[in-house]
Amino acid sequence: MSKDFILAVDQGTTSSRAIIFDKKGNIRKIAQKEFTQIYPKSGWVEHDAMEIWGTQSGVMREALEFGRVKPDQIAAIGITNQRETVVVWDKETGDPVYNAIVWQCRRTSSICDEIKRDPQFVKYIKENTGLVVDAYFSGTKVKWILDNVEGAREKANAGKLLMGTIDTWLIWNLTRGKVHATDYSNASRTMLFNINSLEWDKKILDYLNIPESMLPEVKNSSEVFGVTDSHTLGGAEIPIAGVAGDQHAALFGHCCFEKGMAKNTYGTGCFALMNVGDKPVYSDEGLLTTIAWAENGKPTYALEGSVFIAGAVIQWIRDGLGLVRSAEDSEYYATKIDSTNGVYLVPAFVGLGTPYWDMYARGTIVGITRDTKREHIIRAALEAIAYQAKDVLECMKEDTGLDLAGLRVDGGAVQNNFLMQFQSDILQSEISKPKINEITGLGAVFLAGLAVGFWKDKQELKSILTTEKVFEPQKDSQAVAHDYRGWKKAVERSKAWAEC
């Protein structure tokens, strides 16, 4: 049977998805299922790792069935995943010892504060992992599990526990425990991986008291990791041939193969990445240095700005405040008024990411008067997404010395034309939206397809992408500067709110 399709496994923060692509990049079928968000305490966020696997395996089978594609027609599987979220499980039983601790979770802030008391070690972490010390990353989450789950430390020291980011957890289950591996992009998000020597950093592991025996093998982003177990997908042994964290996969899906090319993904969070080539660039502006992907043992590096809350603020005004009935309604209400009338909403629900890195910042609405209506709050929530993206992209310009020559965008929120136009205005730059909005999944299948020869080279990948719409700035630079000053003032009000 001919291998006409590639399956993207897209495991996100709020849902598990499976997308079947053909050779022209067309989508044959998408299946999606949401799963439970667990909030045990304020600032804590967890997922049930078994529910993640259950929903993910379920949507894979659903996509094949309703897409009328047989497992034998799948040339390869590409995995892309929510990053930093980490699972620790029993090597023998495959059972997690605790829920997955999600990237948004702030429970390890006190551990990070302890690390920050040693400036030399903080410097070592930045220079060798490319990251800042923050509860966002996997390393301190693993330490917390080992220190707080009964018996976990003893089992880990005895070599009985394994850890991994979500890609590793899925690969383990897809292969029924035959493969314990991750890729360079996901490894670079743990705060445990040395992006210069390209190996797990023993000094950091020792500091956090994490046994190296727990850690997965690190492989190229485009490489055959193994094959699915015959019991997993209808008896077929399908190569798992592409793996990348969601934002890295999106950069690859946008075909940002050249140095200086950038993209922004608008999902639960908001993430901008710029390809900086084959050597890491370290930021003075609060950006992260990360591995975008690796091929043949050679990494491509990127600068990244991470915004914790983007699309999630629209979920909040829908579910938490009841201001809209659907996310789509937000555009309607935002366009009923000409401005926010001086209202700013800073969605620092779990702190602030780039460039502020304030774990203790909290959400703030400022500028409210007796005339403030729900439309102003809704519009301010949308504008906050664009302002946060501008914060990040301004830092990239400072670190690289490059002006932003257009931005490629993807994610659910790019369907909101008001947001995209406001983003173009506030950046004073062109915004390009591709016809294929499933860029993250596309990046995963591009990586997998190259590994198995489904596509011959990157030039062929570029021919698959086409632009749907280009947004041009419609607001003058002086007005933009005035509005942005207001945003920066609002951010200052939100800082250090939850500090002990």
Curated annotation (Swiss-Prot):
Q: Which residues bind sn-glycerol 3-phosphate?
A: T13, R83, E84, Y136, D246
Q: Which CDD domains match?
A: FGGY_EcGK_like (cd07786)
Sorted keywords for this record are: ATP-binding, Glycerol metabolism, Kinase, Nucleotide-binding, Transferase
Q: Which GO terms describe its molecular function?
A: ATP binding; glycerol kinase activity
Q: In which pathway does it act?
A: Polyol metabolism; glycerol degradation via glycerol kinase pathway; sn-glycerol 3-phosphate from glycerol: step 1/1
* Broad enzyme group: transferase
Enzyme nomenclature, EC number = 2.7.1.30
Residues annotated for ATP binding in this entry: T13, T14, S15, T268, G311, Q315, G412
Q: Which family does it belong to?
A: Belongs to the FGGY kinase family.
Protein name (database record):
Glycerol kinase
